[in-house]
C-alpha cells in the first residue's frame, strides 16, 4: 500500500457539525469529496460597493426553512463559475471565513448558493478537506448535533 505524503490532521465522518464563528452559527455540513469547492446556503444575495470594496449581504439558515434566518455581510472574495453535480454551470459569489470543526480551525472559501432543496445547508468540498481523512461509514466524529 502506498503511504500518504502527509500526516492527516484528523479523521472526519461523512457529516459533521461545523461552526462559522464570524456568522455566529453552527451547521450540519455534508462532506463531499466529489466537489472541489464548498458551498453555503444563501438567500437574498446582494452586492454593494463601499469605499472601493465589494461587499456581499445574504441570509443563511443553520437548518431548513423553519430555522431562524441569519443576516450576514462580508467582503466579497471572488466570483467563480461552478459546475454542479448535475452538470449545470453557474456563476457564484465566494466568501472567505473561519471554520471550526471540533478542535480544528481553518479558513475556507464558500460559494453562496440556494440549497433550500438540499438536505444540508453546507457542503464541504476537497479544498477545505486538505490534509483530512474522510471515514464515509461514520458521522459526527467531532460532536453530535
PLM features per residue range, with description:
Residues 1-145:
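Pepsin/retropepsin-fold aspartyl endopeptidases
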Amino acid at each position: 500500500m502506498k503511504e500518504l505524503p502527509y500526516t492527516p490532521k484528523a479523521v472526519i465522518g461523512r457529516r459533521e457539525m461545523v461552526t462559522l464563528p464570524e456568522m455566529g452559527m453552527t451547521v450540519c455540513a455534508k462532506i463531499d469529496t466529489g466537489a472541489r469547492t464548498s458551498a453555503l446556503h444563501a438567500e437574498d444575495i446582494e452586492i454593494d460597493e463601499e469605499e472601493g470594496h465589494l461587499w456581499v449581504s445574504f441570509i443563511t439558515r443553520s437548518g431548513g426553512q423553519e430555522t431562524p434566518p441569519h443576516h450576514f455581510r462580508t467582503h466579497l472574495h471572488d466570483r467563480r463559475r461552478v459546475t454542479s453535480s448535475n452538470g449545470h454551470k453557474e456563476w457564484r459569489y465566494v466568501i472567505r471565513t473561519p471554520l471550526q470543526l471540533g478542535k480544528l480551525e481553518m479558513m475556507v472559501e464558500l460559494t453562496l448558493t440556494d440549497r433550500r432543496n438540499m438536505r444540508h445547508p453546507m457542503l464541504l468540498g476537497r479544498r477545505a478537506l486538505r490534509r483530512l481523512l474522510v471515514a464515509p461509514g461514520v458521522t459526527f466524529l467531532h460532536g453530535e448535533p
